[in-house]
Design a protein with these regions (language model features):
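Short, gly/Ser/Thr-rich active-site loops of penicillin-recognizing serine hydrolases
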Residues: 576-577, 581, 671-736
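Small/polar-residue-rich segments within soluble enzyme cores
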Residues: 71-73, 77-80, 84-87, 91-106, ...
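Conserved, well-ordered alpha-helix/loop/beta-strand core segments that scaffold catalytic motifs
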Residues: 313-353
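Short, small/polar residue-rich loop motifs at catalytic or cofactor-binding pockets
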Residues: 132, 137-141, 301, 349-353, ...
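N-terminal propeptides/low-complexity segments immediately following signal peptides
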Residues: 26-78, 742-752
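Carboxylate/His-rich catalytic cores and anion/metal-binding grooves
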Residues: 280-307, 351-377, 487
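Sec-dependent N-terminal signal peptides
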Residues: 1-26
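Beta-lactam-recognizing serine transpeptidase/beta-lactamase-like catalytic domain environment
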Residues: 154, 308-320, 359-412, 417-663, ...
């Protein structure tokens, strides 16, 4: 006979569907079409000229001192995998926007214990003047995390723990208590449950101090796992199933680095029952959005009341206050596209890469995918040490998001910034043709091209061919030229070198300045640094999120939008407590003409240049390839990029794809990364076509303060003075390089 059991009435959430200048200009410059005609057209093999897009960074001295780390760094412990636990500041925004409501609550679970809610017992208890009342807390279910359309990605569900329910035994001898406990544990194990080791002292201590509460003797079991075992449980004397809330990540591994995971806030108390003891473990966010919005997601606890008579016998237990669910976090992600991106990475990479897509007008992040990933459900309710060690020791670092926490040289994708900067400062125009040899001599170093091409080209063709000597010259050797400082200043305007201010632990990457150079290399900027930076190498490091963000500014043409990952935060009643509003991060109105020319070059890259493998069947596309060495030189590893925007004529989305190669692998952005892009967009053809027919969401308001004539003249004078100072600084740098060369310093070794 099954003993009377303490059954907690519990509320569950319904599962919703759930270099020196080389000649000024050739007499016969190449057009983009002529340049593209010379490109190989093999769509499968990796042509030599694409593979050789990788050009090793030229070391000018002091580089061995630097502490900048590329790639991803694995956490050393469980605690290191989570972001710092700081309070979440949620701005109170205006209402409006898409309404998302929390799902309705189920009715109370059936209560089988006749003492619960029994009016006669309540009346009897009220007549006992010496009765003691004890209130316990019932942790509330955590709220939902959804995609932009309300599709649930994380929710709470009811699960069960096998337990012993002693109650008040007539025979309270230690032998009888232990006999009952061991028989019950054995019966659960025979029924197919996993059980936990319990010592005799633990069993006896629980009976003496907490016998009116069930003792969990096994790990949590989800409803689908429990279903075939329920009938067996009914036959086990002193058995009990403790209902509790646990987290369910409905799409498994999808968006795991964004969602994060939860863990027990503290172990259940032992010893005598105290007021406000939880009846099961409280869960708290440990990583990702679960951590950042832990306060908003945490449910409001209910109150369970126990009453004992003067002899210590339980005379009443009831749910006095129902627990309430937490709020809802509505992200900017598109769940379908997120899944498609992760699938494309899995299919078209060696298991290591990233894909990011951003709305170019609103800054909403619609895809933030990284490979490899992990199943956050393994952390629920607690991950085993073995499973965690397997994840932590995996050389592919699945716990780290390459999309926002991996830093890499942006390689030739950064040439879009170099060209934009050169156009912005008047170093070149679209009609400026530069004679480009195979290599450019800067100081005592030869800065080479990735192919044997030579000729006179303009900036559009330079992007099509991904030509290095063009970039070297406009950045370092032409008169006038950009210089490293101005190039880095422009890079920062496009989001490089700083975190994105999203609710995730993203990395800032690195954009050097004079102070950084002195701290890291023991010297200031040199002309060779400008050359290295111009092709996205040297000390420049960025995340895939930053690269996609920068491209969104180019595609937008007027401003760099502020990135957003959360659309709305709702309270438990469905009231909007935060509403996303598009915002401008950087006003780029002074670069509109320059960015239009860059977009022209990026269109040509896909139509016939190094990025033609990214061409789509149903919509125009534009982009830029990139390939670079990264990591330790001894590893001989390369990475491939493809970053762009679509549609090419009226840009809606900017994106960046990253492919991490294995040691000694011959790769190129135009082959590997472009394939990731094409496979992704073709797989979402139907939904993307539908999305492109919907009017685009409102853009951010760009400041339009017009300058007075006096202010305009002052601005021109400031820019002229800035250009003169930059030119003078370059002259000083060249003089320094000559002196160092005479003293034998610039042989590449660090200054001692």
């Amino acid at each position: 006979m099954v003993r009377g059991k303490l059954i907690f009435s519990i509320i569950s959430l319904l599962m919703p569907w759930v270099a020196a200048p080389v000649g000024a200009q050739s007499q016969q410059p190449l057009t983009p079409e002529q340049a593209a005609a010379a490109m190989p057209d093999d769509a499968e093999a990796v042509p030599a000229d694409e593979v050789e897009e990788t050009v090793e960074t030229v070391k000018l001295g002091g580089e061995d001192k630097t502490t900048v780390q590329e790639g991803v760094q694995q956490a050393e412990s469980y605690e290191d995998t989570v972001a710092p636990d700081s309070p979440t500041n949620v701005e109170i925004g205006g209402g409006g926007g898409e309404e998302v409501t929390t799902p309705p609550l189920k009715t109370d679970e059936e209560v089988m214990d006749p003492t619960v809610h029994d009016p006669s017992r309540v009346a009897y208890a009220s007549t006992r003047p010496n009765a003691r009342t004890m209130s316990l807390t019932v942790p509330g279910p955590r709220g939902l995390i959804t995609d932009r359309d309300g599709h649930v990605m994380a929710c709470s569900e009811v699960a069960w723990q096998p337990a012993i329910n002693f109650g008040q035994l007539k025979d309270e001898s230690e032998a009888n208590i232990l006999s009952i406990a061991r028989k019950t544990i054995g019966a659960f194990e025979a029924a197919g449950f996993k059980v936990l080791e319990k010592t005799d002292s633990q069993l006896l201590d629980h009976y003496r101090n907490r016998r009116w509460l069930p003792l969990a003797i096994g790990p949590t079991v989800r409803e689908r796992e429990l279903k075939p075992l329920r009938e067996k449980v009914k036959q086990i004397e002193y058995s009990h199933l403790i209902p509790l809330y646990i987290r369910n990540y409905t799409s498994g591994m999808t968006a795991c680095h964004i969602l994060g995971y939860t863990g027990a806030k503290a172990k259940l108390p032992t010893g005598p029952i105290n007021h406000n003891d939880p009846i099961f473990e409280r869960q708290e966010g440990r990583a990702g959005l679960e951590l950042k919005f832990n306060k908003q997601l945490t449910g409001k606890p209910g109150i369970w009341r126990l009453m004992f008579d003067e002899s210590g016998n339980k005379i009443l237990d009831e749910l006095q206050t129902k627990p309430k669910p937490g709020g809802t976090i509505v992200t900017t992600l598109n769940l379908e596209w997120q899944k498609a991106a992760e699938q494309s990475l899995k299919k078209n990479t060696l298991g290591r890469g990233a894909f990011v897509m951003v709305d170019v007008r609103t800054g909403e992040i619609v895809v933030l995918a990284s490979a490899p990933n992990f199943d956050p459900n393994k952390f629920i309710p607690a991950i085993s040490q073995k499973d965690y060690d397997d994840l932590r020791n995996d050389p592919n670092t699945p716990l780290v998001s390459r999309a926002f926490a991996g830093v890499y040289p942006p390689a030739s994708t950064f040439k879009t910034i170099t060209v934009a900067a050169a156009l912005r400062y008047g170093i070149i125009s679209e009609n400026t043709y530069v004679n480009c040899p195979f290599s450019v001599r800067i100081g005592n170093h030869d800065f080479k091209n990735h192919s044997k091409f030579t000729g006179s080209i303009n900036c559009v063709t330079a992007l099509v061919l991904s030509n290095n000597p063009f970039m070297y010259q406009v950045a370092a050797t032409r008169t006038p030229h950009l210089g490293a400082q101005r190039l880095c200043d422009i890079a920062r305007r496009f989001g490089y070198g700083s975190t994105a201010d999203i609710p995730l632990p993203d990395k800032a990457g690195n954009v050097p300045d004079e102070n950084w150079m002195h701290r890291s290399y023991g010297r200031g900027f040199m002309a060779g640094d400008a050359a290295n930076l111009s092709i996205g190498q040297g000390a420049l490091l960025a995340t895939p999120l930053q690269v996609a963000h920068a491209i969104s500014g180019i595609a937008n043409g007027k401003y760099l939008p502020k990135l957003q990952l959360v659309r709305q935060v709702l309270d438990a009643e469905g009231n909007v407590v935060y509403q996303f509003t598009p915002a401008v991060q950087t006003n780029l109105s002074d670069m509109e003409n320059a960015l239009a020319i860059v977009r022209k070059g990026m269109k040509a890259v896909v139509n016939g240049g190094t990025g033609r493998r990214a061409k789509l069947s149903y919509v125009s596309n534009a982009g830029k390839t990139g390939t670079a060495q990264w990591g330790r030189p001894s590893d001989d590893c390369r990475l491939a990029w493809f970053a762009g925007f679509m549609p090419a004529e009226e840009p809606r989305y900017a994106y960046a794809a990253l492919y991490e190669g294995k040691p000694h692998q011959r790769i190129s952005g135009g082959h590997m990364a472009a394939t990731v892009v094409r496979e992704f967009f073709e797989s979402i053809k139907t939904s993307m076509q539908a999305a492109l027919t919907v009017p685009q969401a409102g853009a951010a308001e760009v400041p339009t303060d017009e300058l007075t004539e006096e202010e305009r003249l002052m601005k021109e004078q400031e820019e002229a003075a800035e250009a003169a100072e930059a030119a003078a600084q370059e002259v000083r740098q060249r003089e320094q390089e000559k002196r160092r060369s005479r003293s034998g310093w610039d042989d590449g070794r660090s200054r001692r």
